[in-house]
Amino acid sequence: CGTIHYSGKAVAPDDLTLLPPPDFTRLADNGYFNPVPVMPVYGCRGCKWRRCRFCAHNSSFGRYRSRPPAAVAQEMLERRVRFGCRHFYVVDQYVDPVYLDALSDAILALGLDCRFQVMARTVGEYTPALLYKAARAGCCWISWGMESGSQRMLDRMNKGTRVDTSLEVIRSAADEGISNLLMMIFGAPGSDAAALEETFTFLDRAWDSIDGMTASAFVLFDQTDFSRHTDRYGLEILGGNRILDLEGKPVHDMKLRFRRESEDGHGESPLAAGEIDAWERRKVWLPELPFHGRLCCEHYLLYADAMQARTRPGKRLRSA
């Protein structure tokens, strides 16, 4: 206990179906602080988009690999039967529209009574019909990697999304009773007062369709496009982020200490702090978001389920 064993570089299997399912036997019996079980499940490893210039997951999770959606739905059904679990936290970094469509079909085909969430990008392929189907299958919460309301900043981050399309997608999800959590980044390289105001304008327009939002300060991670091309983005790396000492040797995570060319920063730029402060002053004039926007993941899922029950999809007749 307390010993770390290192046996060499980890090998990422190509065929995820060869991996055994996780064993939750010892956790499932009174091992949760939640009122009901919430279990993780995954369909893919790595990110199918894998182009965001700020994201460490492009390297940390390796290349994109996926499991058959039918196998994921079957695993969820087995946990429903064995552990009485109907709430599932999908840990995939990005569930693209094609995979969400197939997973929803598989869940509906099994007649599985479940609730789950996914993380996604606000692209137009998340059509109203797909979101309707996903809600019928049990999707009650989507975390959207929106990052910014400025098209210039989205292009600079290489998100592959459009501001106007994003607004349509978020509103369509809300129409189906799906809880929208927006993940925003403040202080990214290239941001300025105009970009910040564009973000505020977007949030004003989308606010009535949002249940929760994270306002994250930009973090420079190793092995990202931003860190590999600091001269291009006006950044200077000051060093790694030391988290602990192991047997007298420093251990660093992927976070890098940095400053912008025009700043005297001591490892973290004041730009992000200033933008977040401006946002905090701005949002007091907006209606308060539901409480579940400030809950941990498992509790957010339970709360989103309860909220969706009030607006269960099916109130409008439309083909899925």
Predicted regions and their residues:
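Acidic, low-complexity intrinsically disordered segments
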Residues: 1-71
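Short, glycine-/Ser/Thr-/acidic-enriched flexible segments
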Residues: 11-12, 44-48, 54, 59-60, ...
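Exposed loop/turn and edge beta-strand positions of beta-sandwich/beta-sheet ligand-binding modules
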Residues: 37, 84, 140
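Structured alpha-helical segments in the cores of large, soluble enzyme domains
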Residues: 40, 44-47, 72-80, 166-174
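Hydrophobic residues within beta-strands of alpha/beta enzymes
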Residues: 55, 86-90, 142, 211-213
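Conserved Radical SAM active-site core
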Residues: 57-115, 128-129, 133-136, 175-176, ...
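A structural motif corresponding to the C-terminal lobe/cap of the Radical SAM core domain
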Residues: 66, 108-301
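C-terminal non-catalytic accessory extensions
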Residues: 293-320
